[in-house]
Amino acid sequence: MAKDIGLDIPEPTKECDDINCPFHGELPVRGQIHVGTVVSAKMDRTVVIQQRREKLINKYQRYEKRQSKIHAHNPPCIDAKVGDIVTIAECRPLSKTKSYVVVKAEVKA
């Protein structure tokens, strides 16, 4: 049985025994929530999410494209793949570069 993490996100259908899973483990989530696309899933239980945005340049009244990459923990119950649109939530630092965990994955058609 999955626990409530405090967000309006449905519980995953699969079970896992990962201690760093916000639904089945001991990891609390707090802080920022981001949405992005998975660009790499080659690491063990880690995905790289690319987040794209547009920033207004006031002088020219035009937008420039910007992007950033965020490393996030990928629990086995969610198991996001490359190309999926995921929602990540901030948590305590899990490693040198990971401070986010995947809480929802939508399969891209």
From Swiss-Prot:
This is Small ribosomal subunit protein uS17. One of the primary rRNA binding proteins, it binds specifically to the 5'-end of 16S ribosomal RNA. PROSITE patterns: RIBOSOMAL_S17. Pfam families: Ribosomal_S17. CDD domains: Ribosomal_uS17 (cd00364). NCBIfam families: PRK08572.1 (NF006345), uS17_arch (TIGR03630). InterPro entries: NA-bd_OB-fold (IPR012340), Ribosomal_uS17 (IPR000266), Ribosomal_uS17_arc/euk (IPR028333), Ribosomal_uS17_archaeal (IPR019978), Ribosomal_uS17_CS (IPR019979). Keywords: Ribonucleoprotein, Ribosomal protein, RNA-binding, rRNA-binding. GO terms for molecular function: rRNA binding; structural constituent of ribosome. Belongs to the universal ribosomal protein uS17 family. It comes from the Archaea. GO terms for cellular component: cytosolic small ribosomal subunit. Part of the 30S ribosomal subunit. GO terms for biological process: translation.
